[in-house]
């Protein structure tokens, strides 16, 4: 680097014209000198500075990265397909859900089946000798009127109750079967 001296000259704030009516007070001319180190540049263009990497990469990796970054999108897609075939992997194997699962956890834990919490009570069949008792049971279990309860047990199978708990479904099934109807829980 070359070392040079820079000079700054301080002047008075008064106008320097000779036509001024006021007598100008002469200010002493002061000069400050201080050294400045300037870089020796061969040309005035900005130089390319590489960003500092968190990890030093080997030259081979840098060259490979430069070549990959110069690929077109079509060439990059072909490269991905080639590497998937060569390495025997798929894009699905890199899904975030696969990362969350611990290796070997699936083999240790048995498959968990979700227990059903809502059930439907279906009246499958009502014999003719049990119609009146079934209508009474339907009216007792619901707030249906006589006509609506009668229409419910005609044209079977029909859903009697939907989305009820297991206990409520079993209780309704028990009462309807005591009345003589054939009932199933779905």
From Swiss-Prot:
<dbReference type="InterPro" id="IPR000206">
    <property type="entry name" value="Ribosomal_bL12"/>
</dbReference>
<feature type="compositionally biased region" description="Low complexity">
    <location>
        <begin position="12"/>
        <end position="24"/>
    </location>
</feature>
<dbReference type="InterPro" id="IPR036235">
    <property type="entry name" value="Ribosomal_bL12_oligo_N_sf"/>
</dbReference>
<protein>
    <recommendedName>
        <fullName>Large ribosomal subunit protein bL12c</fullName>
    </recommendedName>
</protein>
<dbReference type="GO" id="GO:1990904">
    <property type="term" value="C:ribonucleoprotein complex"/>
</dbReference>
<feature type="compositionally biased region" description="Polar residues">
    <location>
        <begin position="1"/>
        <end position="11"/>
    </location>
</feature>
<keyword id="KW-0809">Transit peptide</keyword>
<comment type="similarity">
    <text>Belongs to the bacterial ribosomal protein bL12 family.</text>
</comment>
<keyword id="KW-0689">Ribosomal protein</keyword>
<keyword id="KW-0687">Ribonucleoprotein</keyword>
<dbReference type="Pfam" id="PF16320">
    <property type="entry name" value="Ribosomal_L12_N"/>
</dbReference>
<dbReference type="InterPro" id="IPR014719">
    <property type="entry name" value="Ribosomal_bL12_C/ClpS-like"/>
</dbReference>
<dbReference type="GO" id="GO:0006412">
    <property type="term" value="P:translation"/>
</dbReference>
<dbReference type="InterPro" id="IPR013823">
    <property type="entry name" value="Ribosomal_bL12_C"/>
</dbReference>
<dbReference type="Pfam" id="PF00542">
    <property type="entry name" value="Ribosomal_L12"/>
</dbReference>
<feature type="transit peptide" description="Chloroplast">
    <location>
        <begin position="1"/>
        <end position="53"/>
    </location>
</feature>
<feature type="region of interest" description="Disordered">
    <location>
        <begin position="1"/>
        <end position="24"/>
    </location>
</feature>
<keyword id="KW-0934">Plastid</keyword>
<dbReference type="GO" id="GO:0003729">
    <property type="term" value="F:mRNA binding"/>
</dbReference>
<keyword id="KW-0150">Chloroplast</keyword>
<dbReference type="GO" id="GO:0005840">
    <property type="term" value="C:ribosome"/>
</dbReference>
<dbReference type="GO" id="GO:0003735">
    <property type="term" value="F:structural constituent of ribosome"/>
</dbReference>
<dbReference type="GO" id="GO:0009507">
    <property type="term" value="C:chloroplast"/>
</dbReference>
<dbReference type="InterPro" id="IPR008932">
    <property type="entry name" value="Ribosomal_bL12_oligo"/>
</dbReference>
